[in-house]
Amino acid sequence: MSQEKYIMAIDQGTTSSRAIIFNQKGEKVSSSQKEFPQIFPHAGWVEHNANQIWNSVQSVIAGAFIESSIKPSQIEAIGITNQRETTVIWDKKTGVPIYNAIVWQSRQTAPIAEQLKQDGHTKMIHEKTGLVIDAYFSATKIRWILDHVPGAQERAEKGELLFGTIDTWLVWKLTDGAVHVTDYSNAARTMLYNIKDLTWDDEILELLNIPKDMLPEVKSNSEIYGKTAAFHFYGGEVPISGMAGDQQAALFGQLAFEPGMVKNTYGTGSFIIMNTGDEMQLSSNNLLTTIGYGINGKVHYALEGSIFIAGSAIQWLRDGLKMIETSPESEQFALASTSDDEVYVVPAFTGLGAPYWDSNARGSVFGLTRGTSKEDFVKATLQSIAYQVRDVIDTMQVDSGIDIQQLRVDGGAAMNNMLMQFQADILGIDIARAKNLETTALGAAFLAGLAVGYWEDMDALKELNATGQLFKASMNESRKEKLYKGWKRAVKATQVFTQEEDADDDAK
């Protein structure tokens, strides 16, 4: 067998871990996936067992080798991408976590976040970290664990405990405890990292009483952090040389290297990230400012908008309403709709994300008539995804002053041609669907490969994930704006409905 060299990407997600082996053309050669248990101790709490995450990663590494007959010695480098914000604290000597990993979705630390807001720290934290104060980010999760595990604060102050997001935990495990690092993109999601000065922020650490010794060293997204311990990589001592949080890895995998380039991943929710270049731009409109990636001594900042419900709206049609049997079927139903009636579905099942950040909003439907069909309802649900993306894109253009020309897309719902065409129409710009939709893992592989010379430079990557299909806007301007104004009215009415409910409760 030829000793061709490859890059392995470890993609550690919220519900499963994957290992994917890529060749020099950026093609997937082998992959393995393993789910792991979700832990829900109380309503709104979401936790993982960090050792189960590690076990799942070991399993998929083996699986990728078994499927392909590729040997560990053929792996030139490893890239890691991960669910962001999820927090692990472990014993420095034994490597044993002192509590479950608190997952990014978990709301158990919301009271800590609310207290920070009430104490007037919103502006300071926003200006330093680019983030809003929220339980979403790692800072409140660290504080919660130190508060709730007996003796944890004292042990942390003695230097006996280490903190890490999942990237840090995996590197620490793969190197058998030799390396305690994170990267710019993951550090930027902790709410402890000053993204302007590129340092852990002493004022925020003091405010939350988090000992600095717990924190990992912050590195660029593409450099050799360490090598795998041979017994953790089937005899191979392989450089770990690329790391990025999942959405930033997708930005890199989409080759969005220039300011103004934007990608959207249509997953359960939708995550829209714009490369804003080397200038940190704080949003005035509820978008997050973060670090896209740092490479070759230069940091690229980004604006991010999160939409809570995208692909999960299609799952709702399938599992909740039983209107469709499979998710891909939604496209055929939508195309069969012959009505021009303006039906709007506002899928605020868990509130509205960017740019509204209205956690009280709930789902609603407007514009139904006796003539409304199942096909019309399915079409309106798909269109709601595109309308929400426009909400964020319009806001990004205002915040950045950049006129967006193209949206690069990936994720499961990006395979829906009807949705992609409507997305192009309602935005009035081109939609470029990646040829390789594995953009998150590919981004981690690219970062790792660049650090070891597997790919020469970023220009060499541009041929490796070309546009698979381009969707061009074809709707006339007046129709486009009429539809979008209807959407804005529907969102406003949805918010008013829950506001009036709150007012009724207050009156009681």
Curated annotation (Swiss-Prot):
Free-text function comment from the UniProt entry: Key enzyme in the regulation of glycerol uptake and metabolism. Catalyzes the phosphorylation of glycerol to yield sn-glycerol 3-phosphate.
Residues where ADP binds: 14, 18, 268, 311, 412, 416
Processing and modification events after translation: The phosphoenolpyruvate-dependent sugar phosphotransferase system (PTS), including enzyme I, and histidine-containing protein (HPr) are required for the phosphorylation, which leads to the activation of the enzyme.
Record GO cellular component, one term: cytosol
Residues annotated to bind sn-glycerol 3-phosphate: 14, 84-85, 136, 246
Entry keywords, A to Z: ATP-binding, Glycerol metabolism, Kinase, Nucleotide-binding, Phosphoprotein, Transferase
NCBIfam families assigned: glycerol_kin, PRK00047.1
Reaction catalysed by this enzyme: glycerol + ATP = sn-glycerol 3-phosphate + ADP + H(+)
Residues with the Phosphohistidine modification: 232
Record: residues binding glycerol: 84-85, 136, 246-247
Protein name: Glycerol kinase
EC main group: transferase
Regulation: Activated by phosphorylation and inhibited by fructose 1,6-bisphosphate (FBP).
A biological process from GO: glycerol metabolic process
GO molecular function, one term: ATP binding
Similarity comment: Belongs to the FGGY kinase family.
Record-listed ATP binding positions: 14-16, 268, 311, 315, 412
Entry's EC annotation: 2.7.1.30
InterPro entries found in the cross-reference section: ATPase_NBD, Carb_kinase_FGGY, Carb_kinase_FGGY_CS, FGGY_C, FGGY_N, Glycerol_kin
Leader peptide range in chain numbering: none
Annotated pathway: Polyol metabolism; glycerol degradation via glycerol kinase pathway; sn-glycerol 3-phosphate from glycerol: step 1/1
Upper taxonomic lineage: Bacteria, Bacillati, Bacillota, Bacilli, Lactobacillales
